[in-house]
Amino acid sequence: MPNARTHDLITIASGAALVPFVYNIATNTLAQPYPEAMANTLWLVGAHILSGLLFSPDLDLDSAIDNRWGVLYVLWRPYMWVVPHRHFWSHSLIVAPLLRLAYFYLVIIGLLLLGAWGLAQIGLVVPDYATELAQRIRAITAAEPAKTLAFLIGFCTGSAAHTIADWSVTRGKRFLRALGITIRGDYRTHDRYIPRRR
């Protein structure tokens, strides 16, 4: 598999390549005015890069990717335990990135609810941030459907860049094996990362 640095370069390069392509579609095909077309392009490309760098399909491994989350890597431990590596749930083009986004949303909501409950146990009352967050997300998606769609498409393309690179290497190795050329490698060390004891 490509290492983490290669995946990052693929994400950045494909994100940069998307800018003129998406802007052209927004202005010519969808006939959006300049400010709206540029905003939607930036939402799509920003989500592409965010997805590729922070919400990578390799979050199901103890790798350099989850270290980018710093101390918040613990948020992804349950995901690692449940989702097998290179499985449909981690490396598909549409379902996997949306699953990671939904998982992250549910974890944040759960932490907000748990925090409010914990503070209520010691007599502190806090606003219902979980409900407020859900309402704000609903309001934003209802008010800005084009930007929401651009974000979701970009989130999927960022993950797809990673997944397609992995698939290409796997298929390339199979092709070489069919020719009698053996390439040895282990996906657990594909990003040259040595797991820390946590």
List the model feature ranges, each with a label.
Residues 1-198:
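N-terminal membrane-targeting hydrophobic helices
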